[in-house]
């Protein structure tokens, strides 16, 4: 029996990058995936799309459905979650992955850019989390994984708005976990390592040679699967680094899925 058999998992921002890798990894463990994103092959002819992620999951026998969702608009979020519940059932696991990054210092950050980053990285998490909490509270079970970033605590002079949004996300994680302790819902932040995504590799191939610290998208999968598969709230309200998975936080008895 796979670790996530019978689970319905929603991953936002899953048409590409880390979100896509997480979705495929969850599907390999038996979960039914709702792929949420804004990049559709109908509007963007590129190969990185909701439809492609869904097809790649189905190609290895997994279960997945795709839904257009702009996490910055509550009406779009509510519509996507209404549709996915009708097709896949109640949500067991929510992975808030959708996010935007701008490498701009504070002095160069316009009001519109600030609003755009906060709207996606914080408001989007609020909208999607609110969309699942009622059913999770009724069932007294559920898992919420917020994909964060160590940039929230770095001294990098750039990406100020992004750093603020991710630090805020981690604080939201801690407060929400405390509020939901009596409902059997775990809420954790997970920080990936410095990740070379598929899109970045295509646009900036020279970046791979500039730093030895790049990690692959798929490296976050074991940590995500472990968090999604845990029962109850033994681990909740934590800001976790996926690079420490297996050393400073537990994986006993958990084997790692492989993904191409």
Where are these regions (language model features)?
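Alpha-helical segment proximal to the catalytic Tyr-Lys
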Residues: 134, 178-179
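Substrate-binding pocket helix/loop in short-chain dehydrogenase/reductase
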Residues: 105-106, 113-115
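C-terminal helical subdomain
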Residues: 182, 189-190, 205, 209-260
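Short-chain dehydrogenase/reductase
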Residues: 2-88, 102, 257-258
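Active-site loop-to-helix junction immediately N-terminal to the catalytic Tyr of the SDR YXXXK motif
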Residues: 109, 155-163, 175, 203
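Active-site helix of classical SDR
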Residues: 129, 165
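Residue(s) in the substrate-gating loop at a strand-loop-helix junction
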Residues: 149
């Amino acid at each position: 029996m796979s670790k996530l058999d019978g689970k319905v998992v929603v991953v936002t921002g899953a048409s590409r990058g880390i979100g896509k890798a997480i979705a495929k990894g969850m599907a390999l463990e038996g979960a039914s995936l709702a792929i949420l994103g804004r990049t559709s092959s109908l509007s963007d002819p590129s190969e990185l799309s909701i439809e492609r992620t869904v097809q790649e999951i189905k190609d290895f026998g997994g279960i997945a459905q795709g839904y257009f969702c702009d996490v910055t608009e509550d009406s779009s979020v509510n519509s996507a979650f209404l549709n996915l519940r009708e097709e896949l059932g109640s949500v067991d696991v929510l992975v808030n992955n959708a996010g935007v990054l701008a490498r701009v210092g504070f002095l160069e950050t316009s009001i519109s850019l600030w609003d755009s980053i906060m709207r996606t990285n914080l408001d989007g998490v609020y909208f999607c989390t609110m969309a699942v909490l009622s059913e999770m509270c009724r069932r007294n079970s559920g898992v919420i994984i917020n994909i964060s970033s160590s940039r929230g605590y770095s001294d990098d002079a750039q990406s100020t708005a992004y750093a603020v949004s991710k630090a805020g996300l981690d604080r939201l994680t801690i407060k929400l976990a405390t509020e939901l302790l009596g409902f059997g819902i775990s809420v954790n932040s997970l920080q990936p390592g410095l990740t070379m995504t598929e899109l970045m590799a295509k646009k900036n191939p020279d970046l791979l040679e500039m730093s030895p610290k790049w990690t692959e998208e798929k490296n976050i999968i074991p940590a995500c699967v472990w968090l999604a598969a845990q029962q109850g709230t033994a681990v909740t309200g934590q800001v976790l680094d996926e690079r420490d998975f297996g050393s400073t936080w537990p994986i006993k008895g958990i084997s790692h899925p492989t993904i191409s």
